[in-house]
């Protein structure tokens, strides 16, 4: 659109926390029966957002009218490492959840639906963490939509929906 002179606003979203519910990315029982959160993020931060907040942010962009026209708006409710996500899950679930940081290549080899695509996505987010997080600035996102949920806030409402296998 931009190449044809149409003024647009681009919205950059983040990892949907609902992937823990619907995409089989929630904690699973590992060797010894303990829960493990497996993500190929190493010690890098993962910008995340509740799916319902994406719609709310889009509404806020429309509501802003011409103020955001021609701009790129990144949205995220939180930036958390895999270890921080595992700790939040442990707190909400009331049981130990450890972080299992696979490499993107190991993740692609899991054989689960979408593992290759997710592995590529995670590799990009891991290798370009600074740029990816900066493009989804938490203060700017909250200025746009003050009701954005943090990972912990989303988790407290949705912990019972996450399948623990």
Predicted regions and their residues:
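Conserved residues in the N-terminal Rossmann fold of short-chain dehydrogenase/reductase
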Residues: 101
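A hydrophobic C-terminal alpha-helical subdomain
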Residues: 104-165
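Oxidoreductase cofactor-interface core, primarily capturing Rossmann-like NAD(P)-dependent enzymes
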Residues: 1-98, 107-114
């Amino acid at each position: 659109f931009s190449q044809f002179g149409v003024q647009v606003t681009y919205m950059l979203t983040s990892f949907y926390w609902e992937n823990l519910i619907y995409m089989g990315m929630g904690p699973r029982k590992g060797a010894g029966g303990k829960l493990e959160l497996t993500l190929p993020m190493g010690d890098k931060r993962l910008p995340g957002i509740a799916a319902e907040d994406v719609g709310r942010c889009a509404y806020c962009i429309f509501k802003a009218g011409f103020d955001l026209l021609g701009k790129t708006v990144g949205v995220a409710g939180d930036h958390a490492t895999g270890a921080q996500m595992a700790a939040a899950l442990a707190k909400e679930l009331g049981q130990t959840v450890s972080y299992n940081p696979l490499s993107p290549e190991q993740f692609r080899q899991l054989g689960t639906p979408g593992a290759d695509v997710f592995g590529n996505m995670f590799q990009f987010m891991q290798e370009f963490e600074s740029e990816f997080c900066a493009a989804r600035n938490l203060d700017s996102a909250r200025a746009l939509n003050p009701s954005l949920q943090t990972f912990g806030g989303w988790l407290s409402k949705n912990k019972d929906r996450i399948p623990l296998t």
